[in-house]
């Protein structure tokens, strides 16, 4: 379908400490994609490092489609920044307490107060691409 919009989306690799996720130095490359491949709009792909979400089917080097938003619900897979680190985890909130939950029993849950300085939600996962 030639009327379908095709565009390129940035791929974010390792995020430099202290820099915004979409800072130019964090962008590995841009890849083309067709809008029809995803149900939701998104802003960038985040390249997965590590196996903390493997039981959710998210493996090392996968590209997770991230929509930039701080509006997330319990059970969403989110990109959270804690000081200079970015992590991909399940989100669970109760009052002011937030629990970031890995999908791998080898990793610990992260407990944090939503008012903690240096903590914020950068976005949520809306899809996944496995390159190869």
Language-model regions, residue ranges each:
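Short, positionally conserved secondary-structure boundary motifs
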Residues: 1-59, 86, 93-97, 122, ...
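C-terminal regulatory/effector modules of DNA-binding transcriptional regulators
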Residues: 59-132
């Amino acid at each position: 379908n030639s009327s379908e919009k095709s565009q390129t989306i940035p791929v974010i690799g390792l995020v430099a400490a202290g820099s915004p996720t979409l800072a130019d130095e964090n962008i590995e490359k841009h890849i083309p994609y067709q809008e029809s491949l995803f149900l939701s709009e998104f802003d960038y792909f985040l390249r997965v490092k590590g196996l903390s979400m493997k039981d959710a089917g998210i493996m090392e080097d996968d590209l997770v489609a991230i929509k930039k938003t701080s509006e997330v619900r319990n059970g969403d897979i989110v990109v959270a920044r804690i000081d200079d680190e970015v992590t991909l985890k399940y989100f669970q909130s109760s009052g002011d307490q937030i629990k970031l939950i890995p999908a791998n029993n080898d990793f610990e849950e992260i407990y944090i107060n939503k008012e903690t300085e240096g903590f914020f939600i950068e976005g949520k996962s809306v899809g996944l691409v496995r390159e190869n």
